[in-house]
Amino acid sequence: MGDSTEKLQANASLRQPKKRFVGRRTADTQAQSSTSVQDVESTSIQKATPRRTPRTLNQVPPEISQDPDILAAIDLLPKNYSFEIPKTIHRIRTSGAKRIALQFPEGLLLFATTISDILTQFCPGTETLIMGDVTYGACCIDDYTARALGCDLLVHYAHSCLIPVDVTKIKTLYIFVDISIDTSHLIATLERNFQPGKTIATVGTIQFNATLHGLKPVLERAGFNVVIPQITPLSKGEILGCTSPSLSAQQIDYLLYLGDGRFHLESAMIHNPSIPAYRYDPYSRTLSRESYDHTEMHTLRRDAIAAARTAKKWGIILGSLGRQGNPHTMAMIESHLNERGIPFVNLLLSEIFPGKLAAMSDVECWVQIACPRLSIDWGYAFPRPLLTPYEALIALGVRDDWEKTHEGVYPMDFYAKDGLGRTKPQAVQTV
């Protein structure tokens, strides 16, 4: 999914995760095909043969994918990071884009100038603009700023298509930046620490999604039952810091997260408190058992909600960092406050700090429509309650507490299909 053509051809005998959406004609074509793909008896990364012929629009021609100069330029970048340079060059050339915005997360900015030079060298007559504002996640895609700067194409790196390309205000290309790792150590570690026959739910960030799917048949041959869960519309196995699938503790023995850091894993732990969670760091090659203080988190959030119920004036913060803020969610909360005769003030912020809000001391409660984890992780540091939209609806009596509706489990579904990060205009009209 997104690999350049030469990689697809080179890996024609290997597996890859199934695409989420397959058209009827493609499905019929596949059904008529007698070609079978055998699992590779290997513990190295398993990338897959394409399950369908790429559309002409997306298929990278050999004059790009096999260009020795382009391949030499790609060698300047880490070999285990797939920046999909040929695909990007092809998209720029075919779209006629002249001014291209490049948006990277902090950890990949060190490659930004190299990628910029490569693209301008092989796409004559174009210029690139590296966007330097902080990018925390897929919700921070900044098509608004890119458009305001006169760009006609935005290339967003290392996050999935949280904001669909038919919604962004300019043409957008998502580059997942698949990271290849040697999985032999991971397999050996799991075999040494987990009993065969156990059921493992594997999750991770989008960079390791292909690896997760490649691991499944290998782990199953080793005697494990492997589940790759999904919370739509995210990809199977993909989790975000605010969005993760809900699993059955009766069916899942372990939750395994592939990736560095805990931020995304904590989302899955909050949503699945009774399932033991483990994290495999592919960089340090360590497997660790992870824990989370659910009692403390629930207490802090309930205290904030209780304090908000007596607040005489509210403040509503709409996050302006990329696409974090949803205006429809804001309008819905405004409507509920108006119904109850509660005065409020609106505030537009790209980043939210305690000192900034403390300056407006007449506001007794804040609800931020930006990142739920800001309230969950750092809400205690703010002088007034800082609620998520979900918590605001509880405080206003619109929704019941998670103890009643989710059997005591705090939901992490902000960007799920019906999550509050995706509020539609119709939801506001029905209030």
Curated annotation (Swiss-Prot):
Alphabetically sorted, this entry's keywords are:
Cytoplasm, Iron, Iron-sulfur, Metal-binding, S-adenosyl-L-methionine, Transferase
- Give any single GO term for biological process: protein histidyl modification to diphthamide
A GO CC annotation given for this chain? cytoplasm
Query: E.C. number, please?
Result: 2.5.1.108
What are the protein's GO molecular function terms? 2-(3-amino-3-carboxypropyl)histidine synthase activity; 4 iron, 4 sulfur cluster binding; metal ion binding
Reactions catalysed according to its record = L-histidyl-[translation elongation factor 2] + S-adenosyl-L-methionine = 2-[(3S)-amino-3-carboxypropyl]-L-histidyl-[translation elongation factor 2] + S-methyl-5'-thioadenosine + H(+)
Top-rank taxon? Eukaryota
Polar residues bias locations: 28-47
Per its Swiss-Prot or TrEMBL entry, what cofactor is needed? [4Fe-4S] cluster
Instruction: Output the InterPro entries linked to this UniProt entry.
Output: DPH1/DPH2, DPH1/DPH2_1, DPH1/DPH2_2, DPH1/DPH2_3, DPH1/DPH2_euk_archaea
Location of the region described as Disordered in the Swiss-Prot/TrEMBL record: 1-57
Chief location category: cytoplasm
Q: What class of enzyme is it?
A: transferase
Task: From the Swiss-Prot or TrEMBL record, state where the protein is found.
Answer: Cytoplasm
Q: Spell out the Gene3D superfamilies in the cross-references.
A: Diphthamide synthesis DPH1/DPH2 domain 1 (3.40.50.11840), Diphthamide synthesis DPH1/DPH2 domain 2 (3.40.50.11850), Diphthamide synthesis DPH1/DPH2 domain 3 (3.40.50.11860)
Q: Could you tell me what the cofactor note in this record states?
A: Binds 1 [4Fe-4S] cluster per subunit. The cluster is coordinated with 3 cysteines and an exchangeable S-adenosyl-L-methionine.
Q: Which family does it belong to?
A: Belongs to the DPH1/DPH2 family. DPH1 subfamily.
The record's annotation in PANTHER family points to: 2-(3-AMINO-3-CARBOXYPROPYL)HISTIDINE SYNTHASE SUBUNIT 1, DIPHTHAMIDE BIOSYNTHESIS PROTEIN
What job does the chain carry out?
Answer: Catalyzes the first step of diphthamide biosynthesis, a post-translational modification of histidine which occurs in elongation factor 2. Dph1 and dph2 transfer a 3-amino-3-carboxypropyl (ACP) group from S-adenosyl-L-methionine (SAM) to a histidine residue, the reaction is assisted by a reduction system comprising dph3 and a NADH-dependent reductase, predominantly cbr1.
Q: How does it assemble?
A: Component of the 2-(3-amino-3-carboxypropyl)histidine synthase complex composed of dph1, dph2, dph3 and a NADH-dependent reductase, predominantly cbr1.
Protein name (record): 2-(3-amino-3-carboxypropyl)histidine synthase subunit 1
Q: Which organism is it from?
A: Emericella nidulans (strain FGSC A4 / ATCC 38163 / CBS 112.46 / NRRL 194 / M139)
